[in-house]
């Protein structure tokens, strides 16, 4: 998020819930998991919501990594830094959307009618066949700065 957004944030709220597996989560996480973890990150500046991220992780991954979902500081560190340091590879699909579905309907994303949507799958070295996490990043167009670095593999 921080590399694609021109603002700095003074607050990041993290919420999670446990959801039953759906066909969508089975597809994006590439495994059967009776329960998946859905995590929301709300990036704020001056109280206004400037960006939003939604993450799915399988319960198997959470348990294997011994992640404490109730420790918000450590979870944020994992989601924002450690997962990328431990990643084997990943892919990103860039889309444009006019719809942002926030869990809390009272929240409104700045510029929500025009957002870049980055769909990111991160794979881990320990289990390279299964995604570590699947992210959806919503970045309002007016705050976006998306650059791609291409290297020869």
Each predicted region: which residue ranges?
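Short linear motifs at protein or domain termini
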Residues: 1-6
